[in-house]
A protein has these predicted regions:
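Solvent-exposed loop segments that connect transmembrane elements
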Residues: 23-35, 74-92, 130-169, 208-226, ...
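Conserved C-terminal beta-signal and adjacent last beta-strands/turns
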Residues: 8, 42-47, 117, 170-299
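Outer-membrane beta-barrel signature, preferentially recognizing the C-terminal barrel domain
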Residues: 15-69, 80-111, 173-179, 229-231, ...
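Gram-negative outer-membrane beta-barrel transporters
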Residues: 66-68, 87-212, 296-298
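Short, small-residue-biased leader/transition segments that mark boundaries at the very start
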Residues: 2-7
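Transmembrane beta-strands of outer-membrane beta-barrel pores
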Residues: 13-19, 55-57, 66-70, 102, ...
Length: 299
């Protein structure tokens, strides 16, 4: 029997210059049309090296990437206690930060039998903030705050002295797992019937960094520390589908159950003062067990 095999490699690079996020374009996008003079286009430099293999029974891809994001616009918000002891909200537009993303990705599909397919993936990344971000702390009226107690700047002749400096060297990027893996298997034991099971794994997911207004001053840089590392988790999903003829109608009945074992896990959070689960805020739990059932009719 003739066997076919294909090997390919590739290298990609790119550069993107894009406008900053809307909130960073204005001094305070919620209350003023005054433009932020420090807003700059964000620059993204990206490099990717890949290798692929194809054969009758097995296919795989491996990619390595490096992305450098310069002049990253950041927008943060929080609360502070004013001179009267009341809780108020602040916002901060920051410019000058940098993010470095690098990692490796692998995926494969194996077909040992006509009725069986195995697929999987693995991804490891190292995503970090770097550099120094600067910005004004604003109150809800769009006024520049002279300090974290809410006092307002009245003399704008030397307003730059009220900028906050945020040191972000080697701070892990939060909001997305930097290590992920998956393994799935699909069976087709008879004509029209499909059975599928998937295992998904997520690790090294960090809480989003937090700026504590009560500790920040304009006299010295505010150093962002390593955020809380959210516990890793895994889920199992199953699905099935059956295609059949209903008279002259071609029908497919299918369904799936996500998070089959109702695994409880934290998907996202904001870092707290002690960088642990006890002080984390805005904790968002992932979905529990969910299911769907579908009927598709082709006339």
């Amino acid at each position: 029997r003739q066997r076919q095999m294909c090997i390919r490699d590739s290298f990609n690079t790119g550069f993107i210059s894009r406008a900053p996020i809307f909130d960073n374009t204005f001094i305070n996008s919620q209350s003023s049309h005054e433009r932020n003079p420090d807003a700059k286009n964000e620059k993204v430099y990206s490099f990717e090296l890949g290798y692929g293999y194809r054969s009758q029974y097995f296919s795989a891809n491996v990619n390595a990437y490096y992305t450098m994001w310069k002049d990253k616009a950041l927008y943060d918000t929080g609360s502070y206690e004013d001179v009267n002891g009341a809780s108020q909200r602040w916002t901060m537009n920051m410019t000058g930060a940098q993010a470095n993303h690098m990692g490796i990705e692998l995926d494969f599909i194996a077909k040992p039998f006509r009725w069986m397919e195995v697929n999987g993936m693995f991804s490891w990344g190292d995503w970090r903030w770097n550099g120094t971000a600067k910005g004004f702390m604003m109150n809800t009226e769009g006024q520049i705050m002279a300090n974290s107690r809410g006092e307002v700047v009245t003399d704008m002749s030397n307003v730059d002295q009220y900028k906050y400096t945020i040191e972000m060297d080697n701070v892990q990027v939060g909001g997305s797992a930097q290590t992920t893996a998956a393994l799935g298997v699909t069976f087709r034991p008879m004509k029209g019937l499909r059975l599928n099971a998937d295992w998904n794994f997520f690790a090294r997911n960090y809480a989003d960094y937090d700026i504590d207004a009560s500790q920040a001053t304009q006299k010295e840089a505010y150093v962002v520390e390593k955020p809380w590392e959210i516990p890793s988790w895994s889920t199992f999903d199953v699905s099935a589908g059956y295609t059949f003829d209903f008279g002259k109608i071609r029908a497919t009945l299918s369904g799936n159950v996500n998070n089959l074992f109702n695994q409880e896990y934290i998907a996202d959070a904001r870092d707290g003062s002690n960088h642990d689960w006890e002080t984390a805020t805005r904790v968002i739990y992932g979905w529990g067990r969910t299911y769907t059932v579908r009927l598709k009719l082709n006339f």
